[in-house]
Amino acid sequence: MSESVHTNTSLWSKGMKAVIVAQFLSAFGDNALLFATLALLKAQFYPEWSQPILQMVFVGAYILFAPFVGQVADSFAKGRVMMFANGLKLLGAASICFGINPFLGYTLVGVGAAAYSPAKYGILGELTTGSKLVKANGLMEASTIAAILLGSVAGGVLADWHILVALVACALAYGGAVVANIYIPKLAAARPGQSWNLISMTRSFLNACTSLWRNGETRFSLVGTSLFWGAGVTLRFLLVLWVPVALGITDNATPTYLNAMVAIGIVVGAGAAAKLVTLETVSRCMPAGILIGVVVLIFSLQHELLPAYALLMLIGVLGGFFVVPLNALLQERGKKSVGAGNAIAVQNLGENSAMLLMLGIYSLAVMVGIPVVPIGIGFGALFALAITALWIWQRRH
């Protein structure tokens, strides 16, 4: 069935504003909840290697539900899917507030996030189109990164004051996102009437994976974004252990401040990409990807706070410039071939598989006692080499 798309090309339509507000509040809750829950694990004396496990159960939900969430996003009005997904996040955060095992509560938040992602990105192609799609992605990424900036800091600072207050603030953010979703126009479903047989859905998802992988442009985008987000999540957890070792600071807030520097940088980089990169010139983003790994390596050797702030902001600028064009490329090409929701679901599978793999390797490295600074050096070097290999591969094909 052909994809039905209802577009309003304005970047500041009522629907777009509602999407951006909902995304900000939802992402704020995600990031505040991570650091609040990490503080809870520390307070309850969980081992250090369990910290990345928290994120692994979150991304495990993405992988488990990947064959189904794309069809959900394309079979219903995406604004309503976003509202349901934020409701699941609210339930997960509330369960942690009431003393349920934090890993179980965070898994429920992961299920909500898995359902939310294809809808939030897929709806951009229904609210705007053509040359403005990259700019719409820039707005979405800027909103997300602003939420990462404020949410991460709020989670760490509030947790230093009172962990329960931090957890309640996360639940309230998710509640606000549910309300914002109400104001998103109820657009027609992109691909209604598809089979809900689980075997058929899995087969359809695998067909979408195959279709996107066979296309050189979407394959390039999938690999690039997967490497970036896998590395980004690993860096976040590396900072939690790096700060007390390299800087001698043991509070919950400092790692969140450092993460905020990355967030600020990504806002700048996303804005630059929206102005300087088009769907026809996506390869311009590749040098920035290589430099991310180089700067991470240099950062790992620092022992002063000010250079650490500056280098992390630079990593963010490079990251924003690298990932925004790749996201836009996948949405535009994927919308035409397998549907925007399915394209983003396939992207989520790739990104979260990369996260799971990188976090697993990182957790294992911590468990066997490798010092955090050598971990950071090796991590940066491997990332730079991986993006270099991807660029060479893309140019040859």
UniProtKB/Swiss-Prot annotation:
User: Where would you find this protein in the cell?
Assistant: Cell inner membrane
Q: Note the InterPro entries from the entry.
A: LysoPLipid__transptr_LplT, MFS, MFS_trans_sf
Stretches of the chain found on the membrane's Periplasmic side: 1-17, 74-90, 166, 248-256, 302-304, 365-366
Major site of localization recorded for this protein: membrane
Query: Which key words are in the record?
Result: Cell inner membrane, Cell membrane, Lipid transport, Membrane, Transmembrane, Transmembrane helix, Transport
Q: Name one GO molecular function term.
A: lysophospholipid:sodium symporter activity
List all membrane-crossing ranges. Answer: 18-38, 53-73, 91-111, 145-165, 167-187, 227-247, 257-277, 281-301, 305-325, 344-364, 367-387
Kindly give the membrane topology term recorded for this protein: Multi-pass membrane protein
What Pfam families does this protein map onto? MFS_1
Endpoints of the signal sequence: none
Q: Would you name any one GO CC term?
A: plasma membrane
Show which residues sit on the Cytoplasmic side of the membrane: 39-52, 112-144, 188-226, 278-280, 326-343, 388-397
Does the record carry Repeat as a key word? Answer: no
Question: NCBIfam families, alphabetically?
Answer: PRK11195.1
What family name appears in the similarity comment?
Belongs to the major facilitator superfamily. LplT (TC 2.A.1.42) family.
What is the recorded function of this protein according to its Swiss-Prot or TrEMBL entry?
A: Catalyzes the facilitated diffusion of 2-acyl-glycero-3-phosphoethanolamine (2-acyl-GPE) into the cell.
* PANTHER family (alphabetical): MACROLIDE-EFFLUX PROTEIN (PTHR43266), MAJOR FACILITATOR SUPERFAMILY (MFS) PROFILE DOMAIN-CONTAINING PROTEIN (PTHR43266:SF2)
Write down what this protein is called. Answer: Lysophospholipid transporter LplT
